[in-house]
Structures are given as structure tokens and as C-alpha cells.
Amino acid sequence: GLFGKIDHRLHTMFETMLTLSQSRGIDSTGVAAIGTKVNIVKDTVFALDLLKSAEYKDKVLKNKNLCLLGHNRAATRGVVSKDNAHPFKQGNIVLVHNGTLWKNIKTDANVDTDSESICAGINEKGVAEVWKEMDGDATVLYFDTAKGTFNMVSNGKRPLVFAYTADMCTLI
């Protein structure tokens, strides 16, 4: 994902990272583009195919984005479908998750995957409460549209690697 000042060079880097990581998750690909509104493009295709789609070009490339979240899914719980592809949006939370939970987070939302239960749980009761319930592996990136914040959380069982651009204006 990227958060901050996203120019053409960084957008190209985001697409390259998404494409290079597609071997880690071949069941579906998705991108959330967050600027003045949230646009999510996802499908049961490889990253290269999603990046070539008219929907991606219209909803992602044509907008000025503050945050880009990308994900390639390897299905562990829940069927392979467009709805079960990441990113997820529940209320103010836009989220991607790497890992597997042994049981879903308790939530009022109707969810089909462990990842979507994390998203709904954070939206309903906050990340601290969700993390107390966490049973499994989880690294989560999420954007809170109400607070305008980008958040990274991990229980250490899945990798979380990040860096800043040289000008310190963008988190990668």
C-alpha cells in the first residue's frame, strides 16, 4: 500500500509491487483508491488483468488518491468470489489482511471471511477490542475514512515491512 503524496512514479511502483506479489495470492486481486471518496476495484483475476481493466482505469487512475491499498488473495476461508476479494469496506474502515484467523471476530455484520470480520469488527468496536479477540495470524492495513488515518497492525505472525520515500511525504 501507499499513503501520502502519490505521484505517477509512486503509482507505477504500487502497480509493480501488486504485480510482483500476485504469486502469493492467485485467487483474486483488489485495489482501494482513497481520495475524496473510496473506490474499490476487485475481481477473481491476476493483478495484471485487474490493472488493465476499464474499471481500474476509471476508478483508480483518473482520481487523485491519498491512499492506495492493494491485495492478492490466497483463499483460506470463504469461497473464491469477487465479494470475498480484498479490500473490504465496512462503515468507515477500508482494510486488507494477510493471515488466517481460526475463528471470525464477533460482529453484527454478515461476513463470509475472517478478513471481512476484522474489518467489520474494527468499524464496530475499534482495533484494540478486535485485537483482544484475535485468534490466528494477522497483519492488517486499514484506512479510517472518518479520522483520515492510515493504520498498520500486526500480531507478529505475518510480515509487515514499510518505508518512507526520501522526502518523507509517502509511506510505502
Give the predicted meaning of each segment.
Residues 1-172:
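Conserved short alpha-helical segments that host acidic/polar catalytic motifs at enzyme active sites
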